[in-house]
Amino acid sequence: MASAKEISQYLKRFSQLDAKRFAVVKVGGAVLRDDLDALTSSLSFLQEVGLTPIVLHGAGPQLDAELSAAGIEKHTINGLRVTSPEALAIVRKVFQASNLKLVEALQQNGARATSITGGVFEAEYLDRDIYGLVGEVKAVNLAPIEASLQAGSIPVITSLGETPSGQILNVNADFAANELVQELQPYKIIFLTGTGGLLDADGKLIDSINLSTEFDHLMQQPWINGGMRVKIEQIKDLLDRLPLESSVSITRPSDLAKELFTHKGSGTLVRRGERVLRATSWDELDLPRLKSLIESSFGRTLVPDYFDTTTLLRAYVSENYRAAVILTDEGQFGAGRLTYLDKFAVLDDAQGEGLGRAVWNVMREETPQLFWRSRHNNQVNIFYYAESDGCIKQEKWKVFWYGLENFEQIQHCVAHCATRQPTLLG
């Protein structure tokens, strides 16, 4: 799945969190129905490695089937299910059955899990005249969840709410998840779906979204349909009220471990992210912080005169100096000038966030052609292969490029890389 170092890095990061701040996992009813084995396997694995997720589930398809069997027509207003007293009795039964089905499956898989079908969401009627017995969450009681976590057991929660007087109300599972997340402020919010993530215009998985740099552009795309638009806006609203380090992952149950424990992931990772600063002079940057970023990223020391002897063309740096791209101008060749990628640095604790890609994407929008070199054992080479038009192997380096127009340009760039002096010691 990944290197032991990668897995260890993420496990250490997650293990340092307060138990209830690790992850909230939102499971749709379709996943419970169609992918229960993969779901229980993934959740059990997390418990085996010492992590306890908080699981909240829906039961939409199951509820549709039971209401239809009872002759109760489905009626929604503004996307919310109108709930009559007759329907509520079925809602309670279906939610409890779905909850117990997941808890029992986890227990049969060797995991410890606790059924929590009430007592978490205090609610009031959303609008009784319009929606019937539908609730709006007013408060979240963490006591049942904390008791489960302290016992080392996975809390499995339904989205049923209760009024202060004890009336059960049907609460939309997405709304309930949002309120739970606001109360817990978790590091990870995970939506498990059958599609395994958000898809672009070509049906290809979007692996990461950095909202600070990509949200406005994304919302302008014609292929962002109504449902996806609402989902992305909801995620942005959610993350805007959480700590900067919090993130949303959308993935399949079977890919949960890969999404959590590898840099590459397997799904769509959405973060509020950081703005990307653009500079054309070293004077515009905090050079001690930039030096620390580069040296930490490469595990080596910059030559002492790097900033004095390197003529900067453009630098792209995340606002907290956790990722950076440094470009230099290598002069005229043919009809245009050549741009060289001198450094691409990402801190260890930012790997897997999509922050490096976000900085790279901002750079690429303004840089139609580029060449660079990388050591043979550089783990980033997989990314470079995907981003380049070609690669030539030298004795010490791999030379990559994109946007170069002809063989003479490529030949010139390869020769330049062979003779360029290293700027990192050790």
Swiss-Prot record:
Enzymatic reactions: N-acetyl-L-glutamate + ATP = N-acetyl-L-glutamyl 5-phosphate + ADP
Lineage: superkingdom: Bacteria
Site (Transition state stabilizer): K26, K231
CDD domains: AAK_NAGK-fArgBP (cd04252), DUF619-NAGS (cd04264)
Subcellular location: Cytoplasm
Protein name per its UniProtKB record: Acetylglutamate kinase
Renumbered residue ranges of the record's region Acetylglutamate kinase: 1-252
Family to which the UniProt record says this protein belongs: In the N-terminal section; belongs to the acetylglutamate kinase family. ArgB subfamily.
Keyword terms of this UniProt record: Amino-acid biosynthesis, Arginine biosynthesis, ATP-binding, Cytoplasm, Kinase, Nucleotide-binding, Transferase
Species annotation: Xanthomonas axonopodis pv. citri (strain 306)
Primary residence: cytoplasm
Molecular function via GO: acetylglutamate kinase activity; ATP binding; L-glutamate N-acetyltransferase activity
Gene name, Swiss-Prot/TrEMBL: argB
Domain annotation N-acetyltransferase: ranges: 274-425
GO cellular component: cytoplasm
